[in-house]
């Protein structure tokens, strides 16, 4: 069976993301056209008319699962229960994909060359203010080089799904899932890219970074003995680097305060453009 005819499911959890879906769902429809793929949108305690947005997208024909209670792990589990194919992708609701993406990513899974695949992530700083734009440039360069950037759009074959197992209720679900797969069975496809938007304000950046810090600490606490974080050397314009490092420092006390008040997983609104 060729990669273009491999059946697969694309699970997209979303909570009140109608604005983002108006941009990303048509792109997903185009990327799925002519493939063996099916989109499964799990609407997670959604009240903003997202289902209507999805049903109005020409050619998408999604399976829509609506959940009354929030929780990303439960949303992902609902998507897994609705899936019927051995090859499965997980796509963030604000990520833009292009035609040919899924065929390229399905190939190593179908051929048994990998159990977990990911596309390279391209970061758009369009619409960001000057300082957040500087931070976004450094972040984008990091994501373009990191060997552990299994996020935004990931794909699993049958063995990968078994090795990963059911989703836990953790903040850093992407990192947890990646760590369940042996490094030799992971593959980032350097010539396949997806696009995401960088946070547009300094406050958004601090919120995003604080959530990442909480997620990393939670994994170390719940799963001791896991692999150490991968460090990718910083590079870029000195002013860009200064802005990036300032945001990192500012996020540390914010993350501690959030932990003190019991903050858990939440939708990252900073990268969900509304216009």
List each language-model region with its residue ranges.
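Cell-envelope/extracellular polymer assembly enzymes that use nucleotide-activated donors
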Residues: 7-9, 38, 176
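A conserved acidic beta->alpha catalytic loop
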Residues: 17, 27, 43-52, 69
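Short, acidic, metal-binding catalytic loop of nucleotide-sugar glycosyltransferases
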Residues: 26-36
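Conserved donor nucleotide-binding strand/loop of the catalytic core
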Residues: 37-41, 51-82
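Short aromatic/hydrophobic "clamp" motif used to bind/position activated sugar donors
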Residues: 88
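Conserved donor NDP-sugar-binding/catalytic core segment of glycosyltransferases
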Residues: 99-128
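Catalytic donor/gating beta->alpha subdomain of glycosyltransferases that bind UDP-sugars
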Residues: 109, 123-126, 133, 168-226
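Terminal low-complexity segments of carbohydrate-biosynthetic enzymes
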Residues: 198-199, 211-275
């Amino acid at each position: 069976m060729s990669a273009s005819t491999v059946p697969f499911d694309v699970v997209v959890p979303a909570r009140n993301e109608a604005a983002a879906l108006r941009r990303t769902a048509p792109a997903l429809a185009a990327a799925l056209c002519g493939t063996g793929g099916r989109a499964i949108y799990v609407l997670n305690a959604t009240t903003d008319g997202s289902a209507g947005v999805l049903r109005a997208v020409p050619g998408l024909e999604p399976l829509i699962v609506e959940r009354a209670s929030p929780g990303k792990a439960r949303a992902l589990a609902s998507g897994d229960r609705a899936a019927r194919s051995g090859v499965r992708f997980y796509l963030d609701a604000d990520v833009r994909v292009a035609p040919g993406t899924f065929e390229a990513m399905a190939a190593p899974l179908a051929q048994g060359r990998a159990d977990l695949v990911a596309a390279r992530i391209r970061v758009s700083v369009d619409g960001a203010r000057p300082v957040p734009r500087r931070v976004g440039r450094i972040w984008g360069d990091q994501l373009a080089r990191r060997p552990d950037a299994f996020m935004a759009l990931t794909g699993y074959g049958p063995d990968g799904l078994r090795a990963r197992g059911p989703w836990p209720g953790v903040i850093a679900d992407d990192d947890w899932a990646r760590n369940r797969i042996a490094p030799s069975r992971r593959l980032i496809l350097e010539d396949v890219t997806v696009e995401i938007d960088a946070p547009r304000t300094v406050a958004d950046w601090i919120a995003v970074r604080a959530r990442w810090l909480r997620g990393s600490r939670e994994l170390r606490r719940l799963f001791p003995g896991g692999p150490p974080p991968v460090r990718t050397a910083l590079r870029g314009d000195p002013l860009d680097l200064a802005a990036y490092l300032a945001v990192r420092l500012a996020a540390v006390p914010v993350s501690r305060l959030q932990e003190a008040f019991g903050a858990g997983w939440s939708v990252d609104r900073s990268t969900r453009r509304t216009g």
